[in-house]
Amino acid sequence: MQIKTVLLAFAMFAALNAQHVLAACAETGAVCVHNDECCSGACSPIFNYCLPQ
């Protein structure tokens, strides 16, 4: 029974990470609030748009 719990926990962890990786990101110039919303990983804190890489 314990191995089933470990396998279930691993499957849930993998599924949650896959959703984050597969989520669409915003292109350069798109409106953003956080860095992780942009494909480049950089959101302007003053103007709230995605910066180029």
UniProtKB/Swiss-Prot annotation:
Keywords: Disulfide bond, Knottin, Secreted, Signal
Keyword Membrane tagged: no
Disulfide pairings: 25-39, 32-43, 38-50
Signal peptide: 1-18
A GO cellular component entry from the record: extracellular region
Subcellular location(s) per record: Secreted
Listed InterPro entries: Toxin_18 (IPR012623)
Domain of life: Viruses
One Pfam family recorded for the sequence: Toxin_18
Domain notes: The presence of a 'disulfide through disulfide knot' structurally defines this protein as a knottin.
Protein name: Conotoxin-like peptide
Species of provenance: Autographa californica nuclear polyhedrosis virus
Phylogenetic classification of the source organism: Viruses, Viruses incertae sedis, Naldaviricetes, Lefavirales, Baculoviridae
